[in-house]
Curated annotation (Swiss-Prot):
The gene is purM. GO terms for biological process: 'de novo' IMP biosynthetic process; adenine biosynthetic process. Pfam families: AIRS, AIRS_C. SUPFAM superfamilies: PurM C-terminal domain-like, PurM N-terminal domain-like. CDD domains: PurM (cd02196). Keywords: ATP-binding, Cytoplasm, Ligase, Nucleotide-binding, Purine biosynthesis. Belongs to the AIR synthase family. It comes from Erwinia tasmaniensis (strain DSM 17950 / CFBP 7177 / CIP 109463 / NCPPB 4357 / Et1/99). The lineage of its organism: Bacteria, Pseudomonadati, Pseudomonadota, Gammaproteobacteria, Enterobacterales. It catalyses: 2-formamido-N(1)-(5-O-phospho-beta-D-ribosyl)acetamidine + ATP = 5-amino-1-(5-phospho-beta-D-ribosyl)imidazole + ADP + phosphate + H(+). It is found in: Cytoplasm. This is Phosphoribosylformylglycinamidine cyclo-ligase.
Length: 346
């Protein structure tokens, strides 16, 4: 072999300098999420975090999630600013259903070719989501993997750890006949059902940037960041006895509400009691999607469902609306041995 060419990692498609530039870009926004329990700074081999001293019997709660094919739509439309918020929301909203306070968050960002501006936009969104939920962004991994992803396409995953007092874990065991169900409104499809969203766009030959809905581009509705409920729900838990919380994600109403119901109970909902944001009506019509499929795929305007005693329902409703949530009484718990765990009356 006579060729004396000296190959570098950059020749192979991995730009270490770009990775370092990204770290420099995000240091400031990451620092703003710091909690007093966090020890050390960004860049260590492992992140250290103490448990808050207020807990007598602290139980750690963990979760991981992604953003699904909402990423594909964001990449196609070159809108990346809300994706980081979505990522945090999917994790911390899962944690808070057990009554847990999120402590820290880590992210994984993988791409074929690192675009510093895009990655910085996503991670800035992650930091914003952490600020909204009160957890610290303590670290992450940026993986530039040529040949694994097409060009600047990327994927993200999030990992969150929270803590709850052992005696205050919310697990659905208190749910009983007569409990009232309160819904907290969603900001849109959140981060679920986007394979169907994209199919509807293609099926109806719709350009989400030029199609208007309620005076703004359809893309604004579809890429609205997932609402983060953590602080308002933690405040509610301190003031009323919450029996169960369901986060409406993949599987919609039919699969998520039963996850927190005891045996021999049934959730009976009144469809007219809450508002469907316009984007759901548009999708149902444009894709000729059945009512059953809408409720199985999307949150249809409901991000969280909270079960509590009828005596606490009015107070909880007032607290949530005063805190800035859109909240409605949407149903009740009934005793039932039916396999149909959720009934939605039109």
């Amino acid at each position: 072999m006579t060729d004396k060419t000296s190959l570098s990692y950059k020749d192979a498609g991995v730009d270490i300098d770009a990775g370092n530039a990204l770290v420099d870009r995000i240091k400031g926004v990451v620092k703003k999420t710091r909690r007093p329990e966090v020890m050390g700074g960004l860049g260590g081999f492992g992140a250290l975090c103490a448990l808050p001293q207020k807990y007598r019997e602290p139980i750690l709660v963990s979760g991981t999630d992604g953003v699904g094919t909402k990423l594909r739509l964001a990449m196609d439309l070159k809108r990346h600013d809300a994706i980081g918020i979505d990522l945090v929301a999917m994790c911390v909203n899962d944690l808070v259903v057990s009554g847990a306070e999120p402590l820290f968050f880590l992210d994984y960002y993988a791409t074929g070719k690192l675009d510093v501006d895009t990655a910085a936009s996503v991670i800035t969104g992650i930091a914003e989501g952490c600020s909204q939920s009160g957890c610290a962004l303590v670290g992450g991994e940026t993986a530039e993997m040529p040949g694994m992803y097409h060009g600047e396409d990327y994927d993200v995953a999030g990992f969150c750890v929270g803590v709850v007092e052992k005696s205050e874990i919310i697990d659905g065991s208190k749910v009983a006949e007569g409990d009232v169900l309160i819904a907290l409104g969603s900001s849109g499809p959140h981060s679920n059902g986007y394979s169907l969203v994209r199919k509807i766009l293609a099926f109806s030959n719709t350009d989400p940037e030029t199609t208007q809905l309620e005076g703004k581009p359809l893309a604004d509705h579809l890429l609205a960041p997932t609402r983060i409920y953590v602080k308002n729900i933690l405040s509610l838990i301190e003031q009323v006895d919450v029996h169960a919380i369901a986060h409406l994600t993949g599987g919609g109403f039919w699969e998520n509400i039963p996850r927190v119901l005891p045996d021999n109970t049934q959730a009976v909902l009144d469809e007219s009691s809450w508002e469907w944001p316009a984007v759901f009506g548009w999708m149902q019509q444009a894709g000729n999607v059945s009512r059953f499929e809408m409720y199985r795929t999307f949150n249809c305007g409901v991000g969280m469902v909270i079960a509590l005693s009828a005596a606490d329902a009015d107070k909880a409703l007032r607290l949530m609306n005063d805190a800035g949530e859109k909240a409605w009484k949407i149903g009740v718990i009934k005793a039932s041995d039916s396999e149909e765990r959720v009934v939605i009356n039109a």
